[in-house]
Each structure stands twice: as C-alpha cells, then as structure tokens.
C-alpha cells in the first residue's frame, strides 16, 4: 500500500484537476448558451432562404443555376473539414476527422484534398492527406462576413475548375450532449428537394426571376457554410461542457476513493503503533 505522503499528494493533485475541469465546464456552459442562441436564430433564416430559392427555381424552365450547378466528371474533390482550435471536447474532433478520412477513401483513385477550418483537424489530417489551407482564425471573430470570404474562395475553386466537387464535414448541433456528424455537398449545387408543396404563385418580379436566382445562389452558399460553422461552434462547446462534467465527476469519485484509502492506511498505521506500544509494555512487564 502506498505511504500516507504519496496518497496525500495524489489527493491534492486530483482535487486541483477537479477544480480546473469544473471551471472549464462552467466557462463552456456560458459559451454554449451564446452559441446555441446564435445557431437557433440562424436556422429559420437559412430555411427560408432555401425555400425562396426552391420556389423561384421551380417556376423556371431548364438549368437556372449557371456555373454553380455544372456537373463535371469527378476527378478532383475538396473536403472542407470543420473542427475546433482546442481539444478537451471528447470525440468532437475525432468524429469529423474520421468522417473526412472515410470520404477520402470513398473517392479512392481521385485527387482528394482537405480545406481545414480548425487547428485540430489541420494538425491530424495533414499527416496523411493534403491540406491546401487552414482557416482556424475564423473562430477568433466568427462573423458572417468572415465566413462569406471563405465561401467565396471555395466557390471560386469550383467555378474555375480547380475542383469538381466540394463537400462539407462538420458536427451538427442537437443539444449539449448530442452532436451528429454531417456530410453535405457544397458544390455543385444539388437539386433542391422538399416534401413541402412548392408555392408558384403569380408574382411580378423585378429583375427577372432567373437573375434573382443567380443572385440568391451565392448568398445561399455563404449561408450554408456559415450555418455549418455555427453548428460546429455550438457543438464544440456542448461537447466540451459534457466532457468536463464527466471529468469532474470522475475526479470526484477518484478523490473519494483516495480519501478512503488514506483513512484506511492512516488507521492501519495508528493500529500498528498502538500494537507496538502495547507489545513493548508487555515486554517490560515480562
């Protein structure tokens, strides 16, 4: 059995760790609330924009997506992996990295590159795959304009023919304990499908509907990427809060076990001392 000093040192170490994880849990909980409010407010806008684009497209004949819907033979694929800049968030980053690798294997025999958004994804994926860019600084000041600039870069890579397909891989936020890895086709634009009936009312449009659609598509792409990053950002804080909650609980259990071990060891030491004293006294009597 470890001596009392070693056990006391372990209790002190575990207690210190518990304080750190508890503090990180509270910080993540505060950040989660703000991030959750942002993605909750974002989703209705994204859904309405998609609905508007769908209604306009349904009332037009032929290909109205222009260069954004161009279907080419898939030879070069760009996977946009959205992770975090920091760890200690459970399997949050691992799941995205694993899915990005799975998509790379799916396109075996083709050129597959990675566009990393987040330091953790860049650090791991760059070891086995080609990472052409890392936009980890976007999380320092997460705004629509900053994300829009990234979306424009991705769009240009597709329009110029540098890549034939671009996909997004990220964690979709459900709640603090649940994040679902999503893979979405970014470009070319996939046909918009919906179970809801399409409204094709008789409206007067200015400018023409096809011009409006071509104006809305870049906006929709920027919104799609912004929503994905916002989802990932909220998922990160939810995953970290959950991980730190579990770590705090485990540290508490370990501390309690160590205290029990310490008390047993201390009791055994005291008992041995008493026995030695009694034995010595009996020896003197004899």
Q: Where are these predicted regions, by residue range?
A:
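C-terminal beta-strand-loop-alpha-helix "lid" module of Rossmann-like NAD(P)-dependent dehydrogenases
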Residues: 1-286
